[in-house]
Amino acid sequence: MTDISEKLDPLVDYIMKNCLWQFNSRGWDRLKQNAGILSQTCEILCGEEPVHETAMDRCYWVDAVILSRAYKARFPWLMAMTKPEIKSLFKALHEKIDHLTVHGSLNTELTVPHY
């Protein structure tokens, strides 16, 4: 697996099929959740300890722990990657998930300002 899309696609597929947090009803909430969960998942996979001081940090941290465990179990090649490679992959993953769940979504409810 040398092409980033070969690594990215199964990670995206897992989130889209198994993670309910991607379905928040407001676009800005989805963006915050994506950033919080994916950044903490990346930190965990890089052997770092995510900051979880606030209630929202802890909420994202729980989902990040679950996602990192699933990724380690299903995609053992992740653990053979270097920290910079993991961070680069997760940057691309974050961009792809933001596009699929918010920016490229046809769900007009995501942009209702009073919702």
From Swiss-Prot:
NCBIfam families: anfG_nitrog. This is Nitrogenase iron-iron protein delta chain. Its EC number is 1.18.6.1. One of its GO terms (biological process) is nitrogen fixation. Keywords: ATP-binding, Iron, Iron-sulfur, Metal-binding, Nitrogen fixation, Nucleotide-binding, Oxidoreductase. Disulfide bonds: none annotated. It catalyses: N2 + 8 reduced [2Fe-2S]-[ferredoxin] + 16 ATP + 16 H2O = H2 + 8 oxidized [2Fe-2S]-[ferredoxin] + 2 NH4(+) + 16 ADP + 16 phosphate + 6 H(+).
